[in-house]
Amino acid sequence: MSLELSDVKRLSTLAQIELTTEQSAQTLDKLNGIFALVEQLRAVDTTGIEPLNHPIATMLPDLALRLREDVVSEANRRDDYQKVAPATQDGLYLVPKVIE
C-alpha cells in the first residue's frame, strides 16, 4: 500500500492541519516508509510462533514478572460522597445539561 500526495492533503484537511507543499511531500515519504515496514512485517510467516508476554522472556525463560496481587486498598466511600452531592440517581452524579 502506498499513498499519494492527494491522500496526504485530504488527511491533513480532515485533521485540520495546515501543511506546506514541502511538508506534505515529507509526510508522504514518511508515511510510505511506515507502510513499507508494515508490509515487510506482514510478509513474515509467524505460523506456530507463540506470542510473547515480555520481550526478554525468550532470553531469560525463568524470568518472573513482578506483578502484585490485585487487592482493594481503599474503602468504597461512594455513598458518603453522594450524600453531599447536589443530585444523584442510581449511584451516578447528575449534572446540568450543557449541550443542546
Curated annotation (Swiss-Prot):
Q: Which InterPro entries match?
A: Asp/Glu-ADT_sf_sub_c, GatC
Identify the domain of life: Bacteria
Entry GO MF terms: asparaginyl-tRNA synthase (glutamine-hydrolyzing) activity; ATP binding; glutaminyl-tRNA synthase (glutamine-hydrolyzing) activity
Question: Which keywords fit this entry according to its UniProt record?
Answer: ATP-binding, Ligase, Nucleotide-binding, Protein biosynthesis
Q: How does it assemble?
A: Heterotrimer of A, B and C subunits.
Sequence similarity: Belongs to the GatC family.
The protein in question is named Aspartyl/glutamyl-tRNA(Asn/Gln) amidotransferase subunit C
From what organism does this protein derive? Janthinobacterium sp. (strain Marseille)
